[in-house]
Structures are given as C-alpha cells and as structure tokens.
A protein has these predicted regions:
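Mg2+-dependent phosphoryl-transfer enzymes with acidic/Ser/Thr/Gly-rich catalytic loops
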Residues: 277-280, 297, 463-543
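Active-site phosphate-binding/coordination module
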Residues: 45, 62-98, 298-399
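Conserved acidic, metal-coordinating active-site core of Asp-based
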Residues: 124-191, 374-493, 497
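Substrate-recognition element of Asp-dependent hydrolases with the DxDx(T/V) motif
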Residues: 33-35, 183-190, 304-327, 345, ...
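Non-catalytic pre-domain segments flanking phosphatase-related domains
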Residues: 275-285, 302-305, 309
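An N-terminally biased module of ancient metal coordination in phosphate/nucleic-acid-related enzymes
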Residues: 1-70, 154-156, 168-175, 180-235, ...
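Extended substrate/RNA-proximal surfaces in nucleic-acid metabolism proteins
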Residues: 51-204, 269, 368
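Substrate-recognition/cap helix-loop segment adjacent to the acidic, metal-dependent catalytic center
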Residues: 197-210, 321-341, 437-454
Length: 543
C-alpha cells in the first residue's frame, strides 16, 4: 500500500519528516509522497533520512490555487524541486505569503491580540505559516480557547483579521509542475462541493491545460465518490492517484495510509504514474537526426538503442509523410519498440505498430484546390500525398530532387483535389532556385487563408501548407497530453524554421550545430557537432 498525499511540520502537519518515514514503515507502506503546502523545504531532509530504508519517498508539493473564487489544490509528484525555474517561481510565491502573514499580524494586534511576526516564525521554524499556525499561536498566548474560536473570531474567511492568500491559478500550478518534470494531480475534488456540471467543467479545463491525474482515492470519499471521480478520470484521460491527506494531530481522525480506516491505495497506482517519468526526445530527421545521406552511423544507432533500453522514448518529428518517415527507419534497421511518429509537420501522429492515426489535421479538398490554383498562377510546383503515395500531376525536376531522400511511390493524377476528396495532411510546394517566390506564396496564403492554413519552410526549397492546427510544436503538445508526459521531461531537436515551434514547446529545445540562426536563437542548447557528425549522440548518451 502507498500514500501519495502527506503533510509534515514543514507546513501544517504535526509529524516531522523523520517521524513520517518511521510511521510509514511501521504501517507497512511501500511509498509515501511528501506534499507540504506551497513548500519543498522538507524534501532534502526526508529523502536523506529515507535512504537505505525499505520505502520510497516521492518528492512532492501541494499548491493552493484559486478557480472561479474557490480554493482548488494541485498536487505535484516527482518534481525536480532543485530546478532553478521552479525554485525562483516558488520563492516569489512564498515571498508574497510572507507579506500577507505580516499584515495579518498587524490586524490581530489592532484587534487586541498582539502577535509579533518574528516570534511566530521562531515558534514554527522552517514551516510555511498558515492559518493553522496562527490559530495554535493564539491558543498558546491565551487569546482564544480553541482552534474553532480563533477562526470564528479572528482569522476565518469572514473574520476581521482575514486576508486572502496570494493565489495562483490551477493552470499556473500545472504548468510549473510540468516544467519541473512532475506529475500534476487534482487533489480531493469532492471536497470542493461543486455541482456535477461545475466539477466536470473544472476537470475538463484542467485536462486541456495538461493535468495528468486526479485523486480518486481519498480519506473522506464514499464508494459513490470514488466511482464518480474514476468516471471523470476515464472521460478526460487522466491517471488515478490517491492519498490520505495525513496531517497528524491537526486532522486526528485521519491516519496515514488508511484515512478513516478503510482507505487502501494499491501499489499499482504508483506503477501507472511512474510511466510518466520516461524522457522523450522529439527529433527532426533530415539535417538533425540523419546525415546528408539519410543514414544513421553505427555509433548513433547504439546510443539510441541504449537510450530506449533505459526506458526512454524517441519520437521522430518530421515534415516527411508517414511512409517516407517509416521507410527511412526500415532502411536503417532502426524501427523501435512501440514506436510512434509525428509526421507531416505535426499534422499526423501515428502508431507505427498498428499504422493507426492517433491525431490528424487535414486540409479539405476545396482548400487543396484553392492553394494549387494560386500555385499554378505563380508557376510553383505542388504535390500532395495519400496514405501510400506521392500524389502529383507530372514528374518534374522538383519531383526527382524531392525523391532523392523521400522514397515513396508516385501516383499520377489529372486533378490532385479530385483525387484527395477526403483531404490531405499537407501540400508540398517546391522551387529549387527562388525562395522569394515561395515566400510571396506563403504571404498570400496567410493573407487569404490564414484562419485555416499556414505555410512553413522546411528548408530554402520546400514550403509546406498545413492546417493551422498542425505544426510540430502543436504535435508535441498533443502527444504529451495524450500520453501523460510532463513537458519538463521532453527534448525537441531541430535545424530549420519548421522546427522552431517544437524547439520552443519542449522542456529543453536543442538546435544542432548546422541549424539556421533562427533555430539556434530559439534553442536552450546548441550541439557541438552537426548532423553529419552524430550531433545528438551526446544527448542520447546522457539521458
């Protein structure tokens, strides 16, 4: 059994982190997550104390957020709490809490209960001061006789000394948890006392923002509550989490691991959540992963296979159509287990084993016709694709140049739009000598069809026309949402303009040494070597 929602004296719990570990061992738990309110101060201590003991301690946090005027809590599990971005964001957030607590001290003093802020902090060293601490302090000073009286007379939501906390939105919390490589969980949704419709709206919106899981097992839930939350999880593709919300003496009826006595959180829940912890490399192919001959070196093959064997995932993310993508991996004997690819510049995500589209964004037949009509006026070559072929009207110099690297059969038709009545993932526009002409064509597309279509350069000769919903960056976001991947566990690697949005979308954007200046400017890291010299080998070796 496990418990993925536990508090210590570093926030409003009464057990020290060492006492928590010892008690969890006494109760036979295999794992606990320390999720103190808005602080990670206890994590170093608890991780160190748990070393060598037969229990896993998961680094976590519980963020207090606000949604439409209501407190909503977001738990983060497996966060990289030493990540500089996370530390800076949390420090700024905590500083705002300190300011608020000092103002509450002034208000209490004005209402006849003198409270010195420095004395309060010394009384609870290392803790994030909450109203629970204020209530206990007021009792110690003899200003009130009970916690309830402290809230009713002074610090409750409608009491004279109350000040609202500096809050973030659930979206903010999900984003910062994801950027820190963590798993975001909507905590105890039943406690928010929302109507079914409003709770459904909350869960739907947070799932759209990248929420990974929901607390479906909790100390106070009824069997009906569990069924309801599991149904929401299934509806919105969320993983299940569970926790007691143990606080020690501050919630005396709730015990670690078992809540009110009947709570059971099986290890299998953690097994599923841990599947989110793999690292993903989304890599462009031509000019990034491949050399000029579209061949993997043996050394790069070994690095990629080792990366995958360690539980990580390579997702080819390319402008190529699917057949042109998978054929290149077949020719290199590099088809990987459970492989998925993002192709046609993010217009298609496909499962290689089943060849089943997971997500696709198509141009309509009417849009194809309109684009080709304008291309013909400008004297620009255009072809498209069906599932297996390059669809074109005639073979030209541009066709021969394109098929040097993309090995697919040619299907000749009189009218491309008529042939592709169900639409197409993209149109490929080629001019081998006149990029300004392609740029002018792209401008026309954006001015006349920009609400539906976009033009993206994959190199100086190729301009691809896609749905505005496509693009490699959007492809990565959709892939991560579908597969419960924290952005902080993603890398995106590229070299050209059509790679820039994915370089920006990933947790770490990588430009290879031969990339354009614009791609390098968008990246967090620039490789030492170019694509012809195994640019990404050090990345695969390091993860």
């Amino acid at each position: 059994m496990i418990d993925l929602h536990v508090h210590s004296t570093y926030s409003d719990g009464t057990f020290t982190v060492q006492e928590l570990v010892d008690y969890a061992l006494e109760k036979g738990l295999s794992a606990i997550a320390l999720t103190d309110h808005d602080t990670v101060d206890g994590l170093d201590e608890i991780m160190e104390y748990a070393k060598g003991k037969p229990i896993e301690v998961i680094p976590g946090i519980e963020f207090s957020t606000e949604y439409e005027g209501k407190d909503v809590h977001i738990v983060g599990l497996y966060i990289d709490y030493k990540c500089e971005t996370f530390k800076t964001w949390l420090r700024d957030f905590v500083d705002s809490r300190v300011t608020r607590n000092k103002k509450i001290c002034i208000k209490l003093t004005e209402h006849g209960c003198p409270v010195d802020y420095d004395e309060l902090v010394k009384r609870y060293p290392g803790a994030v001061i909450t109203r629970a601490h204020f209530a206990a302090f007021l009792m110690e000073k003899g200003y009130v006789k009970s916690r309830e009286e402290a809230f009713d007379r002074y610090i409750g939501d409608n009491a004279p000394c109350f000040l609202p906390r500096e809050k973030v939105t659930p979206k903010d919390a999900i984003r910062i948890i994801s950027e820190a490589g963590g798993i975001s969980i909507l905590a105890h949704p039943v406690l928010y006392k929302m109507s079914d419709a409003r709770l459904d709206k909350l869960v739907r919106e947070l799932a759209d923002e990248g929420l990974i899981g929901i607390e479906a097992l909790y100390s106070t839930y009824t069997a009906g509550d569990v069924r309801h939350i599991k149904s929401l999880a299934n509806q919105y593709n969320l993983l299940i989490s569970g926790g007691s919300d143990f606080h020690g003496a501050n919630k005396p009826k709730i015990d670690l691991g078992t809540g009110h006595g009947s709570l059971e959180i099986p290890d299998e829940i953690l097994t599923e959540l841990k599947k989110c912890l793999a690292y993903y490399v989304f890599s462009d192919m031509d000019g990034t992963l491949f050399d000029e001959k579209c061949v993997f070196s043996d050394a790069l093959k070994d690095s990629i296979r080792g990366f995958v064997e360690r539980g990580n995932v390579l997702v080819p993310t390319t402008g190529r159509p699917y057949k042109g993508t998978i054929n290149a991996f077949i020719e290199n004997d590099m088809v990987l287990p459970d492989m998925k690819v993002i192709c046609s510049n993010g217009a298609l995500i496909i499962d290689v084993e089943t060849e089943t589209p997971v997500i696709e964004f198509k141009l309509t037949s009417e849009e194809i016709r309109e684009v080709i009509k304008k291309a013909d006026e400008l004297g620009i070559y255009v072809h498209s694709y069906d599932d297996d072929n390059i669809v074109l009207r005639e073979e030209t110099e541009e066709t021969r140049f394109y098929t040097r690297k993309v090995h697919m059969p040619l299907k000749f038709v009189e009218d491309i739009a008529d042939e592709l009545k169900d639409g197409a993932l993209k149109l490929m526009c080629i001019d081998l000598n006149n990029k300004p002409k392609l740029e002018a064509f792209r401008t026309w597309i954006h001015e006349n069809m920009g609400d539906r279509l976009q033009g993206i350069f994959s190199n100086d000769r190729y301009m691809e026309v896609l749905s505005v919903k496509a693009g490699k960056g959007n492809g990565i976001k959709a892939f991560c949402k579908l597969n419960h991947i924290p952005i902080g566990r993603t890398y995106a690697c590229g070299d050209q303009e059509n790679d820039i949005d994915m370089i920006k979308a990933a947790g770490c954007g990588v430009a290879v040494a031969n990339a354009t200046a614009e791609a390098k400017a968008a990246a967090d890291v620039i490789t030492k070597d170019d694509a012809s010299h195994d640019a990404l080998k050090p990345l695969f070796d390091s993860i």
